[in-house]
């Protein structure tokens, strides 16, 4: 039996943004690690303001923060999908979850290195 392809109803930009903010809200409430990343981001922003880093370094720091938070949201989305698919032990789902967690770790380490280099350079030249 051939079914026509699924065609979602057109949505307004307001609805799309509402759903996106809902997703961020769910990510913050559902994941304690997301809150840790937000606290770390606040510390980084405060330290960058205190050290008066230049606009290029601000851009790098904010990009790193955004990448880590986005990776955490993707990880959360994969976790929600895995729970919806199967509650039993499943090697493929476990691998997907581990890879997603690895992506968060890689972005977090990269962000820490970038932040460390920026702050170390600023602290040693001030």
Predicted regions located by residue number:
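Active-site-proximal acidic segments at structured loop/helix or strand boundaries
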Residues: 82
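Short basic (Lys/Arg) and small-residue
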Residues: 96
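Hydrophobic alpha-helical transmembrane segments
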Residues: 1-77, 85, 89-91, 101-126
């Amino acid at each position: 039996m051939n079914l026509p392809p699924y065609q979602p109803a057109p949505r307004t930009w307001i609805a799309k943004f509402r759903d996106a903010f809902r997703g961020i809200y769910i990510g913050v409430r559902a994941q304690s690690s997301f809150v840790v990343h937000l606290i770390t981001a606040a510390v980084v922003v405060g330290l960058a303001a205190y050290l008066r880093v230049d606009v290029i370094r601000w851009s790098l720091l904010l990009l790193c923060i955004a990448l880590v938070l986005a990776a955490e949201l993707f990880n959360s989305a994969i976790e929600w999908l895995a729970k919806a698919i199967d509650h039993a032990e499943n090697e493929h789902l476990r691998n997907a979850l581990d890879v997603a967690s690895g992506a968060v770790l890689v972005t977090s380490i990269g962000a820490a290195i970038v932040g460390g280099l920026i702050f170390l350079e600023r602290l040693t030249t001030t």
